Amino acid sequence: MQFDVVATNPPFQDSTNKKKTQHKLWIEFTQRAFDQWLKPEGMLLQVSPNSFLSPSNKILKLMQQKDVKYLRLDTERYFPKVGSTFADYLIYNRSSDKKTEIIVNDNTFEQTLDSTIFYLPNDISKESLEIHKKTIFNITNKLNVKYDYVTCHNTLIHRNDFISRTKTENHIHPIFHTNAQVWYSRVRQDWSNKKKVMWSRSGYTKPFYDDCVYGGTDMVYYVLVADDTSGYNLANNLNTKLMKYIFKTAKWSGFGNEKLFCSLPDLPTDRAMSDSQMYELFNLTKEEEVYVENYVG
């Protein structure tokens, strides 16, 4: 049986089989609404967590494929005693190239939700989306960001003695983990001996130049550079207010995201840029510059 309308606030997770279920029930429920329950042209009216803003989220991908009439992202105001964030939305079971009405804190604007917008910034507004378009979404030349998720994965610290939180006779090779933690490894990663700009996806994103000192855990991302000058310049440019804004507003659950990092623009390494030069490089309007300045502080 299929329906013209499904109106729901689906269960968040399986409270009975928590240990057996690795997915969130509300996501599966939403997918089934379109795969099984709704007629063609039928509509889903739903309240759910707003955790679908991040890259690769299944619900955001679904929205990109359907006709989203409206998307309200401040729904938690109606649930003041619930410590979570919510959204509500109306989605038709059909494809569409029409714009979606997005509502946040009494501000309303229209935006096409297509595959070029592979995440929604956590300060979503008309201004923020324009800034992310100019800096991330519409960029073709990207930084060559690298990572190593295998050699020194942080879970190894619980499984064997391959890595250690402290330096020992066997663990002599420093590996960058988070802004506050440097661990040590029994082996030297081949890229450790190369000049690079690196950062952790945990906590604040603070790129810095490393002159062949550190390796890294699976938390770490890096960009190889030709020399010291290039390294210091790139680190400077990645720490300008515009990039700090991008890192801050494209972060979910306290962590940066691989897809964002691998979509960073190929910034100059031949010079250290000022904030105003960075704004000019990406053609930000004066209003957008003020928005970034006010947000970053």
Language-model segments: what does each one mean?
Residues 9, 48-51, 202-203:
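A short beta-strand-to-loop transition that corresponds to the Sensor-1 phosphate-sensing loop
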Residues 10-11, 49, 265, 281:
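Proline-rich low-complexity regions
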Residues 13-14, 52, 97, 205:
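Glycine-rich nucleotide phosphate-binding loop and flanking beta-alpha elements
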Residues 76-291, 296:
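C-terminal substrate-recognition regions of SAM-dependent nucleic acid methyltransferases
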